[in-house]
Amino acid sequence: MDERFIAYIPTAGSNVAHAEITSPKLVKMMIKRAKKPILILGENLEDKEKELIEKFIEKYNLEVIKTPEEMNLMALIKFLANSSYDLALFVGITYYYLAQAATHLKQFSNVITVSIDKYYQPNTLYSFPNLSMEEYLDYLNKLLEG
């Protein structure tokens, strides 16, 4: 794990299936091991983030679906649940929409879901922790290293 200390305090009566907090190093390993990864790209990204995400897509030769431009998120989730993709990375999607979509994938498919947004997403299987913009850009740069 990175330098950050993040306390895990389970809430009373909560589901134990929360996202594991992950690091850029682990995300890189997941992408390299995946047979068919895909990136779901939302529109909630600032210019600095967009540049780094474009480099990230190029570096790992990821298939990309832009939502809502190319496909509605709910239709996309149904598509992913029945597809041969084994790893789905999410970035730039409105938090509460992604929460619902990731819950559906978690319950009804075998797709490994990873949120690479700057906010922790408990409904994916893996997620970056809550990050400031500076820390988030650093995480994205670490994804591009090596």
Give names to the regions the model predicted.
Residues 41-42, 90-93, 116:
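Short His-Asn-centered micro-motif
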Residues 1-11, 96-146:
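Glycine-rich, acidic loop regions that bind phosphate or pyrophosphate groups
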Residues 22-26, 75, 100, 139-142:
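Well-ordered alpha-helical segments embedded in enzymatic catalytic cores
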Residues 1-2, 20-21, 27-33, 70, ...:
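Extended interaction regions within the primary functional domain
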Residues 1-60, 64-66:
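Cofactor-pocket helix-loop regions in the catalytic cores of large enzyme subunits
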Residues 46-107, 123-134:
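Glycine-rich, anion-gripping cofactor-binding loops and their flanking helix/strand elements
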